[in-house]
Regions:
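Short intrinsically disordered terminal tails
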Residues: 75-77
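Basic/aromatic-rich interaction segments and small domains that mediate binding to polyanionic partners
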Residues: 3-65, 70
Length: 77
C-alpha cells in the first residue's frame, strides 16, 4: 500500500513501549521511501501522545467496516 502524508491508518501490531494497541488510529505525518512512515497518535482531545517510526507493514488503511472506540491512554512517567 502506498501512503501519503495525512492519511489515517490503523496500527496492525502492539507497541507496548508506547502504550499503543493494535487497532489504534494514527495519522501519517511523514513518508520515508521506500517502506517507512512517521505516524502520530493523539488522544480524543487532540494531544499528541506518540510519534513513532513504523514500517508500512505495521499499519493498514482504514476501511468502511472499521468502528472507532475510545480507551484510556496510560502516560509514561
Amino acid at each position: 500500500m502506498k501512503y501519503k502524508e495525512l492519511d489515517v491508518v490503523v496500527l496492525d501490531k502492539e507497541l507496548p513501549d508506547h502504550d499503543l494497541r493494535r487497532g489504534d488510529l494514527g495519522t501519517v505525518v511523514h513518508v520515508y521511501e521506500p517502506n517507512g512512515l512517521e505516524v502520530e497518535f493523539v488522544t480524543a482531545s487532540g494531544r499528541t501522545e506518540a510519534l513513532v517510526t513504523l514500517a508500512v507493514g505495521d499499519v493498514r488503511p482504514v476501511v468502511d467496516t472499521d468502528l472507532i472506540s475510545v480507551r484510556p491512554f496510560r502516560r509514561s512517567a
